[in-house]
Amino acid sequence: MDPVDPNLEPWNHPGSQPRTPCNKCHCKKCCYHCPVCFLNKGLGISYGRKKRRQRRGPPQGGQAHQVPIPKQPSSQPRGDPTGPKEQKKKVESEAETDP
């Protein structure tokens, strides 16, 4: 390892800065450009402020794409409308007449 001038700050050491500035390209070469590019572009880790996404407003024209939903009739109980009690009585009466 080459000796480094002790009076030089660490961020000014030779080889500490890449020769070209960082850019917004995400190609393989630019992802490995420097440690910061690798973290941000290669791994997707960013410690900066997160941008707030703006909500999209409703499209002009209001209800152009909305179809009204028809009212459904209230649900009715399924099965025999006479009810379970009358069925039990029928079964009991049939059981008495069989023997």
Curated annotation (Swiss-Prot):
Written domain comment of the UniProt record: The cell attachment site mediates the interaction with ITGAV/ITGB3 and ITGA5/ITGB1 integrins, leading to vascular cell migration and invasion. This interaction also provides endothelial cells with the adhesion signal they require to grow in response to mitogens.
Supply the name of the protein. Protein Tat
Additional note from the record: HIV-1 lineages are divided in three main groups, M (for Major), O (for Outlier), and N (for New, or Non-M, Non-O). The vast majority of strains found worldwide belong to the group M. Group O seems to be endemic to and largely confined to Cameroon and neighboring countries in West Central Africa, where these viruses represent a small minority of HIV-1 strains. The group N is represented by a limited number of isolates from Cameroonian persons. The group M is further subdivided in 9 clades or subtypes (A to D, F to H, J and K).
Q: Where is this region: Core?
A: 38-48
Q: How does it assemble?
A: Interacts with host CCNT1. Associates with the P-TEFb complex composed at least of Tat, P-TEFb (CDK9 and CCNT1), TAR RNA, RNA Pol II. Recruits the HATs CREBBP, TAF1/TFIID, EP300, PCAF and GCN5L2. Interacts with host KAT5/Tip60; this interaction targets the latter to degradation. Interacts with the host deacetylase SIRT1. Interacts with host capping enzyme RNGTT; this interaction stimulates RNGTT. Binds to host KDR, and to the host integrins ITGAV/ITGB3 and ITGA5/ITGB1. Interacts with host KPNB1/importin beta-1 without previous binding to KPNA1/importin alpha-1. Interacts with EIF2AK2.
Q: Which residues bind Zn(2+) 2?
A: 25, 27, 30
Recorded hits in InterPro entries, A to Z, give: IV_Tat (IPR001831), Tat_dom_sf (IPR036963)
Compartments, record wording: Host nucleus, Host nucleolus; Host cytoplasm; Secreted
Annotated region (Interaction with human CREBBP) at 1-24
- Pinpoint motif Cell attachment site by residue range: 78-80
Whichever gene encodes this chain, its name is: tat
Q: Motif Nuclear localization signal, RNA-binding (TAR), and protein transduction: residue span?
A: 49-57
The ranges of region (Transactivation) come to: 1-48
- Domain of life from the UniProt record: Viruses
What does the similarity note say?
A: Belongs to the lentiviruses Tat family.
Kindly list the biological process annotations in GO that this record carries: DNA-templated transcription; positive regulation of transcription elongation by RNA polymerase II; positive regulation of viral transcription; symbiont-mediated perturbation of host chromatin organization; symbiont-mediated suppression of host innate immune response; symbiont-mediated suppression of host translation initiation; symbiont-mediated suppression of host type I interferon-mediated signaling pathway; viral gene expression
Is ATP-binding among this UniProt entry's keywords? Answer: no
MF (Gene Ontology): actinin binding; cyclin binding; metal ion binding; protein domain specific binding; protein serine/threonine phosphatase inhibitor activity; regulatory region RNA binding; RNA-binding transcription regulator activity; trans-activation response element binding
Residues binding Zn(2+) 1: 22, 33-34, 37
Stretches of Basic and acidic residues bias are at: 83-93
The UniProt annotation puts the region (Interaction with the host capping enzyme RNGTT) at 49-86
What's an example GO cellular component term for this entry?
host cell nucleolus
Alphabetic keyword roster = Acetylation, Activator, AIDS, Apoptosis, Host cytoplasm, Host nucleus, Host-virus interaction, Inhibition of host innate immune response by virus, Inhibition of host interferon signaling pathway by virus, Interferon antiviral system evasion, Isopeptide bond, Metal-binding, Methylation, Modulation of host chromatin by virus, Modulation of host PP1 activity by virus, Phosphoprotein, RNA-binding, Secreted, Transcription, Transcription regulation, Ubl conjugation, Viral immunoevasion, Zinc
Cross-link Glycyl lysine isopeptide (Lys-Gly) (interchain with G-Cter in ubiquitin) residue location(s)? 71
